[in-house]
Every structure is written in structure tokens, then in C-alpha cells.
A protein has these predicted regions:
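Mobile active-site "lid"/loop adjacent to the S-adenosyl-L-methionine
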Residues: 70-72, 94, 98, 111-142
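SAM-dependent Rossmann-like transferase core, predominantly class I methyltransferases
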Residues: 1-36
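Short glycine-dipeptide loop
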Residues: 142, 147-153
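C-terminal catalytic and target-recognition region of SAM-dependent MTase-like enzymes
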Residues: 151-208
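Conserved SAM-binding loop of SAM-dependent methyltransferases across substrates and taxa
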Residues: 49-61
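S-adenosyl-L-methionine
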Residues: 69-115
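Conserved class I S-adenosyl-L-methionine
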Residues: 37-48
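Conserved SAM-binding motif I beta-strand of class I
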Residues: 62-67
Length: 208
């Protein structure tokens, strides 16, 4: 992975997400083992530098990687090359995530797994405004329409205090109730070696 420190304290990877990568990676690999002739299709929205994309691809999924920043998608491709995964079936898309999902619905496309890692605030390539408290629930509603008849998982991450684990669980439980499955949510964090505590780094809501 290619790391680059930024003034806003990002380095290009969120290591606390490793537990989620292991979680959906296991689901994907088990599905591939059971039915190797049927691709597991995963949609990664707000995909950033590709940590989740590469974890899904390494597990055997066909991944659609969507981010509004052309430079960030180029960085994700560099990471795929550095990780030896550039030849995996990954579609690299520079687009506004909401508009991409709307088009995918019209095209009739479906996915077995969906990953969402939305920012608290952002702008699309054409100036589209994203505010997580206002925008994330309608996007979950749209994404539910993209799930296949036998979906595998849905993951949403939050780095804002306005979307706590219980809120994520509520949204997923409400919108995915048509599918049999279980919802859980949790805080994610990084272990601190000096004191044995865990540094909170956000929250995740998961359906499978």
C-alpha cells in the first residue's frame, strides 16, 4: 500500500477497518468455494484508496470501485499494482456515488455485497453536495434496490458522532428487512500498545 501523509491527518489507509475486511473477505471466499462458477459482485462506494476493494478482490470478488475523486481512484489503482492485485476483476469508476447508484438501478444491475464508507461532508465531481446526516439514509434505500436475490453482506462505516452504532443498526434493519439475515453494529478502533486501551475510530453497521 502506498501511504502519503496529508495535512488533515489522513495517510491513505484506515487500519481499523481490517476487522471488517476480514469479515466480508471470509463471506466472499466461502461463497466462491461453494459456487466458483458464479461471480460474487461487490459495490464499494466512497471507495477512497481501495483498502476494502482490494480485500474483496483478494477474497475472490468482482468489485466495482466508485469514488468522486479522479486522483484518489488513480491512487487506488497504484495500491492494486503494489498489492499484486491489478489484474483482478475490478472496475474503477470516477463518479458521484449517488448518481452512479441511480444509474445502476435504471440499468438493472445488482450486487451481492455493498460497502459504503461515506465522508461526513463532501462534493461530487460536478459540485454535488454530500452531508452524511441528510444523505446517507436515502442512499441506503437506493442501495437496497441494487442487492441481488441472494445477497451476501452490506457494510456501512461512519466517522461522525451523528451516526452511532445503534443508528446504523436501525437503518440497516429497516431497509433490509425484506432479506433474511442479521444486523450488528460496533465501534471500531485501534489498540494502543502503551496503555492497552482501544482508540475509538468510528462505527460500523453490518448486515449478513
Amino acid at each position: 500500500f502506498n501511504l502519503k501523509p496529508f495535512s488533515f491527518k489522513h495517510t491513505g489507509i484506515f487500519p481499523e477497518q481490517a476487522t471488517n475486511w476480514d469479515w466480508f473477505g471470509h463471506l466472499i471466499s466461502e461463497k466462491v468455494k461453494k459456487n466458483p462458477d458464479k461471480p460474487v459482485k461487490v459495490l464499494n462506494l466512497f471507495a477512497y484508496t481501495g483498502g476494502a476493494t482490494l480485500a474483496a478482490a483478494a477474497a475472490g470478488a468482482h468489485v466495482t470501485h466508485v469514488d468522486a475523486s479522479k486522483g484518489i481512484v488513480a491512487w487506488a489503482k497504484e495500491n492494486a499494482t503494489s498489492s499484486g492485485l491489478i489484474d483482478k476483476p475490478i472496475r474503477w469508476i470516477v463518479d458521484d456515488c449517488v448518481k452512479f447508484v441511480q444509474r445502476e438501478i435504471r440499468r438493472g444491475n445488482h450486487y451481492d455485497g455493498i460497502i459504503m464508507d461515506p465522508p461526513s461532508y463532501g462534493r461530487g465531481p460536478k459540485g454535488e453536495i454530500w452531508k452524511i446526516e441528510e444523505s446517507v439514509y436515502p442512499l441506503i434505500q437506493l442501495c437496497a434496490q441494487l442487492l441481488s436475490d441472494d445477497p451476501l453482506f452490506f457494510l456501512i462505516n461512519s466517522y461522525t458522532t451523528g451516526l452511532q452504532p445503534a443508528v446504523l443498526s436501525y437503518m440497516l434493519s429497516t431497509e433490509l428487512k425484506a432479506f433474511d439475515g442479521q444486523v450488528d453494529s460496533q465501534e471500531v478502533g485501534l489498540p494502543v500498545s502503551s496503555n492497552g486501551l482501544v482508540l475509538p475510530c468510528g462505527a460500523s453497521g453490518r448486515w449478513s
